[in-house]
Regions:
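Class I S-adenosyl-L-methionine-dependent methyltransferase catalytic core
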Residues: 1-69, 73-223
Length: 223
């Protein structure tokens, strides 16, 4: 699809209410995200495939020796992830930074992003989910988050109201910290019925490390 065809497709959204499924990603965000994850996971750029485009059918793409790095419709993300997991497709996908996707916490890894203003004007708390990481459950890289947000806006920070051993994607502040999959105790919804989106009960040690990372980044932390 050419740039002109892409712009023409985007134009039909102009007079409609904006939703995350109507978003299209600024080129500077695409390039920055690709650079970061190609470096983080040693991805060969020639192997990247972007199956989510007007008229595309991700279920019938040829994924042989490919890695998906794309921004899919968020409303279909759980179905897409399940399809890729079932078929052994490697992926790094944009996702809603508040809700995440499915509760496959033993299989997926979330990279904290930030608020991105998409080219249709929608402001979306954007994170990234992948199945290419066997040990880390949540990765927070302050430099990545800061630079991502500066590409389109100044962004905002989320106020955390959870205990030191509780975490959700939306409450991970911009700092340098990694949660290992082995440090997850259980899904947070087993003890916090008021919690929204992907979240975990984690070990005290992981919570203390997170506190220290946030303190170094200049945030007020939990006791």
């Amino acid at each position: 699809m050419t740039d002109e065809e892409y712009k023409a497709w985007c134009a039909h959204f102009d007079d409609r209410p904006k939703t995350t499924d109507d978003c299209y990603t600024p080129r500077q965000v695409i390039d920055f995200v690709e650079d970061y994850f190609c470096s983080y996971y040693n991805i060969d750029r020639s192997k990247i495939i972007r199956p989510f485009y007007p008229g595309g059918d991700y279920e019938h793409e040829d994924y042989t020796d490919k890695v998906v790095l794309d921004n899919p419709p968020f409303s279909l993300l759980a179905k897409i992830v399940q399809f890729y997991q079932k078929n052994g497709v490697k992926f790094v996908l944009y996702c809603n930074g508040t809700t995440g996707t499915t509760k496959m916490h033993g299989l997926l890894t979330y990279h904290i992003g930030g608020t991105v203003i998409y080219e249709n004007g929608a402001r979306v708390n954007t994170a990234f989910v992948t199945n290419m990481n066997e040990t880390e459950a949540i990765v927070s890289d302050r430099d990545f988050s800061d630079r991502l947000e500066k590409l389109t806006n100044k962004g905002t920070r989320v106020k955390c109201q959870y205990e030191i051993d509780e975490i959700t994607l939306a409450t991970v502040k911009k700092c340098d910290w990694v949660l290992l999959k082995s440090e997850i105790i259980e899904d947070i919804h087993k003890t916090r019925k008021d919690s929204f989106g992907i979240g975990y009960k984690i070990t005290k040690e992981a919570g203390i490390r997170r506190n220290e990372a946030e303190r170094k980044a200049g945030y007020v932390t939990r006791n």
